[in-house]
């Protein structure tokens, strides 16, 4: 694969990560209206007269998003030409660009006309899909699947259930987390893991939003732990699956820790951004596992004379 394409794909992936973190920074610092009700300009000007921290954050996010959109478009065109023969290339290229444009339009609509918190909570999730698609394109360009013998994978039904179920459910968790930010419910519950030491259940809307997210997060932590145990028992000889789940477990635990620290530090900005970073990485890993699962589904369910069910019926040595 062309060295220049690999470098460009890596840079584009990092740029998309900056888009995600930048969006979280805008929300955390309440900088969404830093440029007023004007888009793409700031207060209708190319160079605003009154420079404020919120304006700098919002304008920087717009510039990074615009640059990332151009880079993603170039990456899509180049990858389409160079490796269009790979089945996943074209769908991933379309997903990465379309969802990046969509998140930009939602952001612009929020600035110009305003949007409800429930609609704005979709903004981060849509960006996350674009980031995951760019990341998968990059992994295909680096031929990671060949390096880890991913082309010979065989997955049993239980592992498929974990992969499909967890990535769908993780998107719900992401939405609840974004809703916490956009409804200003991050500090609605002063205690952790319960909302308050003196009572078990929330009593008002913001507390319900916060505790709903914590409950959803607890479920995904347990689910990923179960999937990791299954991978450790049956997939040690398939390192891309085994280590994929190990990394997922470490990331979701880091997500839990930073989520708790957000409460204990009363919304420390760096910890809040780390919280967004870890969920972005986790979704990227889960997306790659999904790609592998979809690939294996297209192949006959036999390997070396044994069925998938036979392979999964006994632990790998």
From Swiss-Prot:
Active site: residue positions: 58
Residues engaged in binding heme b: 213, 275
Principal EC category: oxidoreductase
Keyword Secreted in record: no
Transmembrane segments: 7-27, 55-75, 92-112, 122-142, 160-180, 215-235, 244-264, 273-293
Keyword terms of this UniProt record: Cell membrane, Disulfide bond, Heme biosynthesis, Iron, Membrane, Metal-binding, Oxidoreductase, Transmembrane, Transmembrane helix
Single GO MF annotation: oxidoreductase activity, acting on NAD(P)H, heme protein as acceptor
Regions of this protein lying in the Cytoplasmic compartment: 1-6, 76-91, 143-159, 236-243, 294-317
Catalytic reaction(s) noted: Fe(II)-heme o + 2 A + H2O = Fe(II)-heme a + 2 AH2
Annotated metabolic or biological route of this protein: Porphyrin-containing compound metabolism; heme A biosynthesis; heme A from heme O: step 1/1
SS bonds (residue pairs): 35-42, 189-195
GO biological process: heme A biosynthetic process
Location in or out of the cell: Cell membrane
Extracellular domain ranges by topology: 28-54, 113-121, 181-214, 265-272
UniProt keyword Phosphoprotein present: no
Membrane topology: Multi-pass membrane protein
EC number, as in UniProt: 1.17.99.9
Required cofactor names: heme b
One GO location term (cellular component): plasma membrane
Classification via Pfam families: COX15-CtaA
Taxonomy, superkingdom: Bacteria
Domains (record comment): The N-half (TM1-TM4) and C-half (TM5-TM8) domains are connected by an intracellular loop. Each domain is formed from four-helix bundles and they align in a pseudo twofold symmetry manner. The N-half domain is the substrate-heme O binding domain and the C-half domain is the cofactor heme B binding domain.
Subunit structure: Interacts with CtaB.
Functional description taken from the UniProt entry: Catalyzes the conversion of heme O to heme A by two successive hydroxylations of the methyl group at C8. The first hydroxylation forms heme I, the second hydroxylation results in an unstable dihydroxymethyl group, which spontaneously dehydrates, resulting in the formyl group of heme A.
Family membership noted in the UniProt record: Belongs to the COX15/CtaA family. Type 1 subfamily.
Protein name from the UniProt record: Heme A synthase
